[in-house]
Amino acid sequence: MVKKLDPRWFPEFEQRRVVDGHMERLDLHGVSRRDFMAFASASAIASATALSLGYPSVALADKGGKMAHLMMTLRLEYVANADTGANAAAKALGMEITSVDGQLDSERQLNQFEQQMAAGAQAVMLHAPGGGSIRRIAELANQNKVWLDNTWGTLPWFTPFEAGDYYTMYAVPEEFSAHRAVTVEVCKAVMNKFGGGDIVGVTGVEGNSTDLIRSRGRNDALKDFPEVKLVGELPGKWNREDSQKAMEDLISRHPDIRGVIAQNDDVADGCIAALRAAGYRPGDDVFISGADGTTGGAESIERGQLLATSANVPQYMGALLTTRLYDVLHGWRPRAAERMMNWRSIAMTKDNLDAYLERYVNNGDTEPYDYRRMSKVEHPDDWDPQAELFPMDIDLEWGGIAKPDGWSYPKEYTEARANGEAEAVREEYAAHYKIDFFGPSPMKQG
């Protein structure tokens, strides 16, 4: 049953004494009555509407709002690219943003979260290195009514539903099929040139949920190529330096390798450096794949050294999570199926590289996205995710990882899948997806 708004919920702001009383209690010295009335009226309507629908009370941000981006580490080009997207989206939406480097340290990020709350952040975008602090950060976010979304590193089987309403979204690219696709490209190249052969893997951080799902996608692809053998793997810890050392070790153990499956583009860069130093010719006598679609990854494909990468586009991650924070700060609320989301990566090779370079690398001052169009607050009728965005299947995301003792599927998640909400969300987002992820920038003139 739809509940009606009760006029008694609204202060009598037509009476000057009521306005003055509210302003005095809020210590709003220097704020005009007109500005106070504009903000108070919107806040009252939003809060009353939320109450009538059974939602928690709504706190509207004044204009853009203030957010923080807790980055995993600036040692990775991916993170720098993602921060570019976050800052561009925040600027377009009028938000104040502060970006801080977590240096691959979950405890440091927890401290940074507390510091940003103390500094007045209303929302935090988290790019965690793992699941070490996510539960505590989510708990603090709910206690202090600070909006939170997270990407990549997390605690498998810990969902926003268990954390509370203020953990608004966990979102990552769908990595199983993405990493499967780039592995297929390497296997096909090895088969076409050598008729088969040995390959190795250089992974990310051991135990990281993204690292695990990428390895599962890789291993699934290898089932279709029995002549291609994975003979060894070592962790590259997501960065160039550690990956170069890992690749050097693998070369000493397996000198006859024909392919390398690198767990991201920074890892691939380190592998290429090690291979070249050892006398190999990447792209000719050994084929390498990466992941993420960083600027460096695209340029490496252009040079012929990297065969393929799964382009999830780090700028998109930054823009997507920033836009979500903006929307919830301004009164929009997600359905259950919108709180855990995937977006579709595109396998990038020389065949489709030019479109990527034009939009994301050689774009000059032209932004790759219409950031305001991503917002359901700014564009309630014609919003566009600008990528294939869809509800997450947590069994695909975390399959093969043991569930904690006593864990059960969150009620909100199972109900959304059972009652058709998840499928309806998938269809709705597909219908709104108009601006092609790999097409020209919507901001390009002419």
What name fits each language-model region?
Residues 202-206, 324-446:
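Hinge/cleft segment of the Venus flytrap/periplasmic-binding protein
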Residues 283, 287-352:
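Flexible loop/turn connectors
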Residues 1-35, 47-49, 53-58:
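N-terminal secretory signal peptides
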Residues 129-143, 218, 236-298, 322:
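Hydrophobic alpha-helical
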Residues 69, 121-128, 147-152, 201, ...:
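Periplasmic-binding protein-like
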Residues 138-177, 294-297:
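Flexible loop/hinge segments that line or gate small-molecule binding clefts
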Residues 109, 169-197, 243-244, 293-297, ...:
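Hydrophobic alpha-helical segments within soluble ligand-binding/sensing domains
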Residues 66-85, 89, 93, 98-110, ...:
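Extracytoplasmic "Venus flytrap"
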